[in-house]
Every structure is written in structure tokens, then in C-alpha cells.
Amino acid sequence: MLEFEGRTIATDAQGYLMDSTAWSEALAPVLAEQEGIALTEPHWEVVRFVRNFYQEFNTSPAIRMLVKAMAQKYGEEKGNSRYLYKLFPKGPAKQATKIAGLPKPVKCI
């Protein structure tokens, strides 16, 4: 559970929101802080990207799909594991989807 703006938001044991509609951009920095991340514009770009990906495909992208999709949209400079791991050192797919209020990617351990 997470207290935010006077309401209780349900999370699973790993901190992922149980209901992605409870997410807001105001909540993202709180979720990021729990991951030890201070959101910068490059972080926001990835967070918004995974939210759009989820809305389009109804699934959270695992790392391979995230890298491939980011490369298609932003080019090789941002669509590579090294860049994404600099932003999300504990796992780009796991941390970005958590901060974006989405379910854990299916293929993430």
C-alpha cells in the first residue's frame, strides 16, 4: 500500500500498482524515489514511452522489446541497453514500468 495525496493506493509486494488507472504524473516521482531514482527529462521520456506502449499493446514491454521499440522511435542512441541501464540501473523494463504505474513485464524475473 502507498499513501498519496490523502488516498491509499494498492500495490503488490514488489511495489507495482495494482490498478494502473490510479497512476498520475504527480505520483511518478514518489514511485521513482522508492527506486532510488530522481526523475530527469530522459527518465520521463522512457516513462511516457512505456505508458504509450502499454496503451497500444495492452502489455508492459520486457527489456528486448523496450530496446527495439525505443530504437525505432528515438534511434540507436536511446534505443540501446546501455543508455536505458544508465537511467534505470536495476532494470529498465522493471523500473520504468513500475514508475509508470504499469504491471511488471511478463518476461521480467
UniProtKB/Swiss-Prot annotation:
Q: Where is the active site?
A: C108 (cysteine persulfide intermediate)
- What Enzyme Commission number does this protein have? 2.8.1.-
Gene Ontology molecular function: sulfur carrier activity; transferase activity
As for subcellular location, the record says: Cytoplasm
Q: Does the record bear Cytoplasm in its keywords?
A: yes
Q: What is its main location?
A: cytoplasm
Q: Which UniProt keywords apply?
A: Cytoplasm, Transferase, tRNA processing
A GO cellular component annotated for this chain's UniProt record is:
cytoplasm
List the Pfam families: DsrC (PF04358)
What does the record list as GO biological process? tRNA wobble position uridine thiolation
Family, per the entry?
Belongs to the DsrC/TusE family.
State what this protein does.
Answer: Part of a sulfur-relay system required for 2-thiolation of 5-methylaminomethyl-2-thiouridine (mnm(5)s(2)U) at tRNA wobble positions. Could accept sulfur from TusD.
Entries under PANTHER family matching the protein? SULFURTRANSFERASE TUSE
Protein name in UniProt: Sulfurtransferase TusE
Q: What's the source species for this entry?
A: Pectobacterium atrosepticum (strain SCRI 1043 / ATCC BAA-672) (Erwinia carotovora subsp. atroseptica)
